[in-house]
Amino acid sequence: MSSMTLFILFVSIIALLFLFINLIFAPHNPKNWTGKSINWVKLSNSGKTLKLLILSINRKVNCGWSNYSGIVISQKIYESIIGNRGSKSALLSVKEQRVYGSCTNNLVLRCTLVGLEISYQAKIPSNSINFKRNFSTLESKLNPSYISGFVDGEGSFMLTIIKDNKYKLGWRVVCRFVISLHKKDLSLLNKIKEFFDVGNVFLMTKDSAQYRVESLKGLDLIINHFDKYPLITKKQADYKLFKMAHNLIKNKSHLTKEGLLELVAIKAVINNGLNNDLSIAFPGINTILRPDTSLPQILNPFWLSGFVDAEGCFSVVVFKSKTSKLGEAVKLSFILTQSNRDEYLIKSLIEYLGCGNTSLDPRGTIDFKVTNFSSIKDIIVPFFIKYPLKGNKNLDFTDFCEVVRLMENKSHLTKEGLDQIKKIRNRMNTNRK
């Protein structure tokens, strides 16, 4: 045997020996991590393959960590089908991240990371969740029925008639579709603009913003939407009048005396009616009757989600209580307030949701309220997880869910838990900056 052959054989034996030692003692073998390394024991819940794994590179704002390297994978599954895999939580839906075992150079990542999601804090039945939606990593476009529900609460169909000597008849006539919100909901207004792909968003004051459409072509698109996805509050009458006015302007009828008078007659019964200037300028105007509206019926849950984003409230109240050991107790409420002209619609929510009650206010409004804790936990919270809010109010809902979780765990009966609830309450609704 030549010296070269002996050398190759020797090198091969050394290489095999080194590989064997490396497999036994190297840091990537969890059974032998000691000292400054993590003393790794195989997790009791490791075993079956994961239901879904995706790279977690782009995270939502609510996420508890950033994964710039892309070596962390995400898993979303339900507690009912989770088997031995994942974190056992009292909550239904858990957002979980695991690390590929091949990432041996970063020992810090050799653990299970659990982060916050909007739906994380709510304990709800598995069949109440939209399973497919949980796997989406992209912000979906607004649902058309959500848009109609939101506009039923916050939208305005405006007919403006202004004195203007530039026009032959001395009056300028414009139709506008407008949604005005606090600037905290600027992102929602931009989503609505993106949905319609017409109009503009303006910052009106330091605290308010507005989405506005007034071009004839743009209003055609707006009208097409609401013809297909109708309003169901009494606002549908204003919409029908608005549509009549828009058609007159499209046909240039506003440039004739007869057409202008017809538009003034519409203006007299839409929204707040004629202002003082118009009442003086057109004293003998023959007004028209407001259109009849169909009996309201909630056919799409996304409509209710949009309507609640506009008009709903998630309330946490801490009040004095003689029966509580701490001297204080917590009351949760889900509230929807509307003009009593929509009394039939608001009362129909009791049957639609299967909970709550209504009360008329002397000031001309009607309230729908859910205060029963079980109804809030088992009906209200699951509904808005499945049909999520899209505006700033979703932050209030997330906080509301956290309080529900604390109360379900009886934390409100301890001083620490009650203090935590007070802290959450103090950042909600009008206190949110």
Curated annotation (Swiss-Prot):
Its main location: mitochondrion. InterPro entries: Homing_endonucl, LAGLIDADG_dom, LAGLIDADG_Endonuclease. One of its GO terms (molecular function) is endonuclease activity. This is Uncharacterized 49.1 kDa protein in ND3 intron. The keyword Mitochondrion applies. Keywords: Mitochondrion. One of its GO terms (cellular component) is mitochondrion. It holds the Pfam family LAGLIDADG_1. It is found in: Mitochondrion. It comes from Podospora anserina (strain S / ATCC MYA-4624 / DSM 980 / FGSC 10383) (Pleurage anserina).
